[in-house]
Amino acid sequence: MLNYVIKRLLGLIPTLFIVSVLVFLFVHMLPGDPARLIAGPEADAQVIELVRQQLGLDQPLYHQFWHYISNAVQGDFGLSMVSRRPVADEIASRFMPTLWLTITSMVWAVIFGMAAGIIAAVWRNRWPDRLSMTIAVSGISFPAFALGMLLIQVFSVELGWLPTVGADSWQHYILPSLTLGAAVAAVMARFTRASFVDVLSEDYMRTARAKGVSETWVVLKHGLRNAMIPVVTMMGLQFGFLLGGSIVVEKVFNWPGLGRLLVDSVEMRDYPVIQAEILLFSLEFILINLVVDVLYAAINPAIRYK
């Protein structure tokens, strides 16, 4: 297992390098001139050219790439073109709000999604199954930005129960986490149901029932453990989805996180911040998949990696 983990970690190097190249090319193909945006609409050509020189945008593209990649290897992503602060500081100040929002959304989505999926599987083709799957399909179909605006209108504007902006208290997390986790809970419910339906028809489940084990214990002890492997896969993928999906939700709720920072950076063509954030998201996806693979072996000892 240790050798497998080490090999996967070493595989990060070429993957992140390829991502770095693609991101660098992508941001430099974006329409618009960051120097003009930073200088302002009233700036003349001389001022814009001076800003370009200060930002290093007057240098050849290959020189800019070498400067970017050589510094990135050392953990230095440069300065933000807009704030002139170190990119690492910009990301660090926004990281925790996004992380806590993602964790909060994931926790409630997994709990409610798995519960709904188990109930739907146990009472298959009956009203609990139909009700759970109807709600799940609705959760998948409803766009996050529309759900967010609806929740703001009802619970903040009309009822005045919850705040709409900020991340200072636990109340600020309720509406964004509900918005962000709704689609994940729906996917988890459908995936858990499909996995449990297969497990409930296995021979060892019938054997446990024949021995007189209660249905609740059969479902929780024998069914849950064996149905968890595909569900854990989906949990890992959905956690990555939450990190990426937070971009829309953070914009709707004016959340002070990485998603809003990325949107603002794209609007201002802040190349260093865009490159560093996408690299961070890529690293998170890779590490999440590695954690999921390790959890496989913990859930099912028959699985071994070489």
Swiss-Prot record:
Principal subcellular localization: membrane
GO molecular function list: glutathione transmembrane transporter activity
Taxonomic superkingdom: Bacteria
Subcellular location(s) per record: Cell inner membrane
Gene3D superfamilies on file: MetI-like
Purpose of the protein: Part of the ABC transporter complex GsiABCD involved in glutathione import. Probably responsible for the translocation of the substrate across the membrane.
UniProt name for this protein: Glutathione transport system permease protein GsiC
